[in-house]
Amino acid sequence: MTEPKKVVEIKNLDLTFNKGKKGANKAINNVSLDIYEGETFGLVGESGSGKTTIGRAILKLYDNFITGGEILFEGKDVRNLKGSELREYRSEAQMIFQDPQASLNGRMRVKDIVAEGLDANGLVKTKAERDARVLELLRLVGLNDDHLTRYPHEFSGGQRQRIGIARALAVKPKFVVADEPISALDVSIQAQVVNLMRDIQAKENLTYLFIAHDLSMVKYISDRIGVMHWGKILEVGTSEQVYNHPIHPYTKSLLSSIPSPDPISERQRTPIVYDPTAELDGQEREMREITPGHFVFSTEAEAEVYKKNATL
């Protein structure tokens, strides 16, 4: 069986804000991560865990803060890209932002917002070609001709996010960082946007890094999931492994915090409390494979216990 192609490969990444200053903050601490072609890799964790920082680092937005490690895109270190290679990478890797209102220019019409990438990269030669491509993109995300000349404030939150998705797809990317793309949306339309992203992924063979707080939605859309806390990835596995067979205490704590819609079971639910200081014991920890494809940040002794429990 052919091994799947790695689109993104992060090796021992360290990233520090305000390095050398009193308020230095090590946002990413020795993180390694692979994202394969055509998959959706979900990244979950509490606010401040470093999820968005990883996504922005992949897109070269935080190059000045990286203090160690590598970020490879199709085998090339993105920090070394220059000239035509950098221009090509800007097209191949795109981002869908968390707040559809703030990420769209309120003074621009939809057709010009979506066409920004086309214009900047010289992907269309005539106005007719430009208009046809913009209309194709709007239809792809469930909008129509009537929306071309409207402004962002004339749309609902879900429609604005669809415009943001169309803009990201305009340059035909291979990889998309979706930074909490549904958290600012009404619950009633979150599933619509996620289903739209899945449909587009199948049509365009896209690879997603899906960053979110909503654990149930991450489970629904993701092939594999990584759990982050304090700048480290603590557990990586398939959606089924992480949700149905969590191993790391923090993952168990995170999942136990999900409220139940049943009021009786909700009253009986006992959340698991995670003590992060338990890992500040000076012992060396690294990502270790517990079951095939299921990795946990642990010491060698902890890994042996996890493996034994996994076979019970």
From Swiss-Prot:
- GO terms of biological process kind: peptide transport; protein transport; transmembrane transport
What the entry lists under SMART domains is as follows: AAA
Provide the ABC transporter domain boundaries: 10-255
Q: Give its E.C. classification number.
A: 7.4.2.9
Give the organism the record lists. Lactococcus lactis subsp. cremoris (strain MG1363)
Checking Pfam families in the record gives: ABC_tran, oligo_HPY
Catalytic activity reads: a dipeptide(out) + ATP + H2O = a dipeptide(in) + ADP + phosphate + H(+)
Protein location:
Cell membrane
Q: How does it sit in the membrane?
A: Peripheral membrane protein
The record's statement on gene disruption is: Inactivation of the gene impairs growth on low concentrations of di-valine.
This molecule's function is given as:
Part of the ABC transporter DppABCDF involved in dipeptide transport. Responsible for energy coupling to the transport system.
One annotated GO molecular function: ATP hydrolysis activity
- The enzyme class is translocase
Gene name of the encoded protein: dppF
> Does Cell membrane show up as a keyword for this record?
yes
Q: Which GO terms describe its cellular component?
A: plasma membrane
User: What protein name is recorded for this chain?
Assistant: Dipeptide transport ATP-binding protein DppF
